[in-house]
Structures are given as C-alpha cells and as structure tokens.
C-alpha cells in the first residue's frame, strides 16, 4: 500500500518554526515527509534536515518524496532518543524541531497494522514493528486492574472497568486475536444509548495504542531533551491530536517557562531554576474550518509552539 498522510496544520507549523535558510532542523515524526518538504524548500544548500521515524514504511516513503534534496539525514529511531541521535550525528544544537503526534493515514488505513477499529485485522498497533510489545500482548496478558487503569487514564473511557472485565472474561475462553473481536467485546460492554456518541471502540483503541507505544512517557522526556538541544531563539512546534497529549505539552511548556519552585512568599528566587523557553502560543493553534472540512482527521489537532531563550 502507498504511504499516504495528509500533513495537518502544514502552513501554520512551517511559519511557527521561523526558518533560517542555513539552519539545522529536526522532524521528529517524518511520516510521509510533508512537513519536511516544506522545511527543505526554505533551506539553502547550507541548511540541514534530520528526519526521524520509527516506522520503516514512513522512511521509505519520505525518501521517495524528498529524493530531490541532498541535505536530509534519515534516522530510523524513536524521537524519545533525540539526544543520542544528535550526539551520534555530532550535532550539538539545532534551530527548530517539529513533532506531529498523529497516527498517519497510512497506518490507520493499512489493516494489517491493527490501529483501526473499522477494519478486522490482527491486534498489533506497533509504530515500530521491531518492538516486542503489541496490542495482542496488552489485551491478552495484562491483569484486569492494569487494563482498567490504561483504559481510564489513556482513553478517558467511562466504561473502562466493565470493558476490562469483559476482555478478561472473553480471553479465558480463547485468546483475543483480532481488532474485530475486540470491537465486539467493547460493543457488548457499553450500553447501547452511549454507542451513539461516535464509535464505541475509539477510546479503548486509543488507550491501547498509547500503552503499546509508550507515547505519553516518550513525549515528556522528548520535550525536555528537545529544548536542551535548541539554539537560542530556536523553536519547538508540537501538533497533538487528543487531550492527554495536549495537556502534557501545555504543562511541560509552563514548567519550562516558569520553573521556579520557591514559595510565593519569597521576595526573590533562591531555587536557581531559570526559565528555558518563552511560550509563543498562549492558546493552541487549531486548523481552519476549511482544513477540517477537507481532512476530517485534523479536527482534534492543536499546535503549541515555544522559543528557546
């Protein structure tokens, strides 16, 4: 299948980076290369782009899309490791970093990846297919209490307790092997009147995907490491697609902008923690009405940007 991914908030994200033609930029989520191509258009031959992705299909697609550009370095890795990636490339500081945290259209549409609740496929959901933990492992081996917490915390699923119980009951008969089987279990666990609010499996699938790929843990560390790697006035632009991610970015940015831990009663700061960034987007940038109509998957997208000081 051809790797397809429509870049969300493309123009807004590129503008937010304030690109210098001889700068060094990192696309932490290369995908099909949509954002990267627009960055490269603004770079001279002295500029450089590092494209990171843990999905080999994405890297292959990006190489084809960006074949006319020679100033690209492709890295098959997780942006969790951005610090060591730049270390290995002997790059100290960069001028801008972008993270697009959405699952690509390709990953959702390719049934065998197991991300979609709309298609029956083996339970997988691994962004990096070289990793061991898959959705199958989570669904069939996690304790009921552990499943409940994942569905509640990562999916904000109001019926998380019941869904977890139904999963455990069903797997005692036979292992749950496909997305279709899991969807049926979820449908039975959620009362009919609540199934009118979008697809009943949406939140559960989100929660399991986040657990499989350790998305929230990765994000927290990656933000800190990215800021440390920015030159003065360098920008970090992050696109999120659900409230959990957006909350992490919002809170982490605030921590880095105002890190002082001194009690309010102290006349001066004595903790020694200095601000590292200035938040550019006091409120997140959202897609235009037109973009939401053209690309329904952009509807929940939010862009937050900060500048290194």
Swiss-Prot record:
UniProt catalytic activity: cytidine(1402) in 16S rRNA + S-adenosyl-L-methionine = N(4)-methylcytidine(1402) in 16S rRNA + S-adenosyl-L-homocysteine + H(+)
Cellular component GO terms, alphabetical: cytoplasm
GO MF term list: rRNA (cytosine-N4-)-methyltransferase activity
Pfam (any one): Methyltransf_5
Matches recorded under SUPFAM superfamilies: Putative methyltransferase TM0872, insert domain, S-adenosyl-L-methionine-dependent methyltransferases
Intracellular or extracellular location(s): Cytoplasm
Signal peptide: none
Alphabetically ordered keywords of this record: Cytoplasm, Methyltransferase, rRNA processing, S-adenosyl-L-methionine, Transferase
Binding site for S-adenosyl-L-methionine: 33-35, 53, 79, 100, 107
Keyword Transmembrane on entry: no
Gene Ontology BP terms: rRNA base methylation
EC number: 2.1.1.199
Enzyme class, broadest EC rank: transferase
Family: Belongs to the methyltransferase superfamily. RsmH family.
NCBIfam families: 16S rRNA (cytosine(1402)-N(4))-methyltransferase RsmH (TIGR00006)
Task of the protein: Specifically methylates the N4 position of cytidine in position 1402 (C1402) of 16S rRNA.
PANTHER family, A to Z: 12S RRNA N4-METHYLCYTIDINE METHYLTRANSFERASE, S-ADENOSYL-METHYLTRANSFERASE MRAW
Protein name from the UniProt record: Ribosomal RNA small subunit methyltransferase H
Gene that encodes the chain: rsmH
